Amino acid sequence: MNSYQNKNEYEILDAKRNTCHMSNCYPKYPLANDPQMYLRNTHYKDWINMCEEASYASSGPSQLFKVGGSIVAKILGMIPEVGPLLSWMVSLFWPTIEEKNTVWEDMIKYVANLLKQELTNDTLNRATSNLSGLNESLNIYNRALAAWKQNKNNFASGELIRSYINDLHILFTRDIQSDFSLGGYETVLLPSYASAANLHLLLLRDVAIYGKELGYPSTDVEFYYNEQKYYTEKYSNYCVNTYKSGLESKKQIGWSDFNRYRREMTLSVLDIVALFPLYDTGLYPSKDGKIHVKAELTREIYSDVINDHVYGLMVPYISFEHAESLYTRRPHAFTWLKGFRFVTNSINSWTFLSGGENRYFLTHGEGTIYNGPFLGQDTEYGGTSSYIDISNNSSIYNLWTKNYEWIYPWTDPVNITKINFSITDNSNSSESIYGAERMNKPTVRTDFNFLLNRAGNGPTTYNDYNHILSYMLINGETFGQKRHGYSFAFTHSSVDRYNTIVPDKIVQIPAVKTNLVGANIIKGPGHTGGDLLKLEYERFLSLRIKLIASMTFRIRIRYASNISGQMMINIGYQNPTYFNIIPTTSRDYTELKFEDFQLVDTSYIYSGGPSISSNTLWLDNFSNGPVIIDKIEFIPLGITLNQAQGYDTYDQNANGMYHQNYSNSGYNYNQEYNTYYQSYNN
């Protein structure tokens, strides 16, 4: 229990309060960063310029986060279905309001400011020159398609709609792509490029869904389907490559800019790119236009470092690599925050957070709590411990901090003195508080303005939030007890803590949600929505799942491999099934691209329900080398999928595709248990 829980003893500040003086009146931007700059030798005019620069950017982030957050929430089914998917997306970028639309311009201006890159009006005009025409063309197409759906005989004809689709396809590929990839501005335009690519792929998805009824010959439907797969690969690789190029350039500026770029491009680019494969109706069928996939993003993002402007806590006082190790986590199995042990210390009359330890558990592994390494100074330096506990079904969905202000003569502590955690179980909200207000000391409040509702257009509430706190990092080693740096890690709220399998959707579970603490997790390539599991030879993956109804499903796996080999899969030791994998790439596993991954049908069929006591999936690697596992997919029987040569992936030559209804499969899932199965404790 938190020993500082009695809120009556302390003042609880209004989050909207804005106490302004020279050192803190400009907006607390960017994001979670302490807004103060180095003020030593700063003149009044310089300070005014800093204020104006920060104010210029303050209108941009909300638009960027709204776009990225809304797209992700819509595709992942986190906000209600209202009308056709593409029509909804168009209204996101071109709201039906009388004022001039500035969504695209706001996004571009914000990223230019983030990158500190000059953006001329001429460049902005060139980049957005075709957007008005695109808007009109998309609106006409959406109206025609809606009329055709209402009455396929008396309103808009299939021929008319086909002409709109053909024209839009050319407009996207010829004009919009080039507009959003202007030389020298590729990174500035990247969120806009990803958003336009999303619109284009949704258009091509419509052809796959409605093309036959619209009167397209089967050869034309197949052509557009392969166009969709081609541009999915092209857009994914372009976005990831451009992102990485910009990320590399940020290393030369400093870690804070590097981390800020990484976070905001994840929210506005990489999260969207991770959704592109879900639009493939051959792999994820849809007859009603909806996406019937339960998917999630397991990537982790990091706040700006509180006190990153304080001498001794950041580059150049420490190396870039050291900062990365202090303020972020290495690739790891997905974890759920259970609570903290905090150590509070004092120097003279300054009381502060001097160290802490994260407590967490793995997915569907609430019975085993792990303690992370202690960060900062423990009680051997004096001070006392206190605890904050989070119940198994609850998460921290919002927080703010107070730390002492760094002011002349820069000799007093600048550490955190208070943290306010907002905790939810999705039915109610509660507050848990570390520390207290220090009314006689100058303090600075830090909020995290990327913590928003699911759609990214408003504040969080206990049942509507886009991220949860996953870890807290403390640097107390580079400048003694008076100066600590703090960063916070967050994961997306789409992640299901129980790996729930539902009977009416294809369910994707990322392999990083394994319940094995020693799993070999490697950094993701950027387009997968998270990190990857590297399954070594004769090693296994264990994944706990939850069935909410009696059902029968089969399993396929998204993987990458530079070798051929054999694997084995089962659930609860029932009917272990061997299947073969083929090489998907000749690249090193650190350089994987979109096309290096394939889906393999394991031919394993499982029947079970909530009454089964052990629902644990086991996947063994008997190949002569490591295999990269991205996701495990659970497919209810009866869903018809496209296959190519036994693999659920598209044929690069577009000639080898056929349909198989899994409900008619002749596989005997009651075959005798293979006595090979050995103890997994070896």
Swiss-Prot record:
Keywords: Plasmid, Sporulation, Toxin, Virulence. The keyword Transmembrane does not apply. CDD domains: delta_endotoxin_C. Gene3D superfamilies: Galactose-binding domain-like, Pesticidal crystal protein, central domain, Pesticidal crystal protein, N-terminal domain. SUPFAM superfamilies: delta-Endotoxin (insectocide), middle domain, delta-Endotoxin (insectocide), N-terminal domain, Galactose-binding domain-like. InterPro entries: Galactose-bd-like_sf, Pest_crys, Pest_crys_dom-III, Pest_crys_dom_I, Pest_crys_N_sf, Pest_cryst_cen_dom_sf, Pest_cryst_dom_II. Pfam families: Endotoxin_C, Endotoxin_M, Endotoxin_N. GO terms for molecular function: signaling receptor binding; toxin activity. One of its GO terms (biological process) is sporulation resulting in formation of a cellular spore. PANTHER family: ENDOTOXIN_N DOMAIN-CONTAINING PROTEIN-RELATED, PESTICIDAL CRYSTAL PROTEIN N-TERMINAL DOMAIN-CONTAINING PROTEIN. Promotes colloidosmotic lysis by binding to the midgut epithelial cells of mosquitos. Has larvicidal activity against Culex pipiens molestus, but not to Anopheles stephensi. Toxic segment of the protein is located in the N-terminus. Belongs to the delta endotoxin family. This is Pesticidal crystal protein Cry19Ba. It comes from Bacillus thuringiensis subsp. higo. The gene is cry19Ba.
